[in-house]
Amino acid sequence: MKLVRYGRAGAERPGLVDATGRLRDLSRVVEDITPEVLTPAGLKRLRAVKADRLPAVKGKPRLGCPLAAIGKIVCIGLNYTDHAQEVSLPLPKEPTIFIKANSAISGPDDPIARPPGAVKLDYEVELALSLIHI
């Protein structure tokens, strides 16, 4: 099951991509793709839904940030040897931990604005773990 959020930025709707690759509207089932929807109970509820009975989404709408209601984003930098070598930096002896604003998350094809004064942007990020406190 591939969960997505689609639509205009700031007004995304919940959806899923079915086994045939077709985008389906999930808004009759859940209000949005939130951390609560990703709990075992929430995922069990979604697995019970028959995707072919959900409305098909027409066209190719924008895909947004995959998760709504994102809290704090804690990151670890330079934790892969290959990436450190790509950016010509040594691996740190201790993990480099930093926090990102949740506004840094975007859809896969959204433009990325370079902050004023920024000289370089790093393109690589891996999602390792999402901690949910309900």
Which role fits each region the language model picked out?
Residues 15, 128-129:
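Active-site and channel-lining beta-strand-loop segments
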Residues 63-65, 85-88, 112-121, 126-127:
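A generic local secondary-structure boundary/capping motif
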